[in-house]
């Protein structure tokens, strides 16, 4: 649910940061 979406968002942001 929301946790999956949150983790996906964090992962996406992390990918953009790196």
Swiss-Prot record:
Keyword Magnesium included in the entry's annotation: no
Domain of life where this protein originates: Eukaryota
Main location: secreted
Tissue specificity: Expressed by the venom gland.
Modification Leucine amide occurs at: 18
Biological process terms in GO annotation: defense response to bacterium; defense response to fungus; killing of cells of another organism
Keywords: Amidation, Antibiotic, Antimicrobial, Fungicide, Secreted
GO CC terms in record: extracellular region
Localization annotation: Secreted
Keyword Secreted among UniProt keywords: yes
Signal sequence region: none
Function: Inhibits growth of Gram-positive (S.aureus, B.subtilis) and Gram-negative (E.coli, P.aeruginosa) bacteria and fungi (C.albicans).
Similarity comment: family membership: Belongs to the cationic peptide 04 (cupiennin) family. 05 subfamily.
Name the record gives this protein: M-lycotoxin-Ls3a
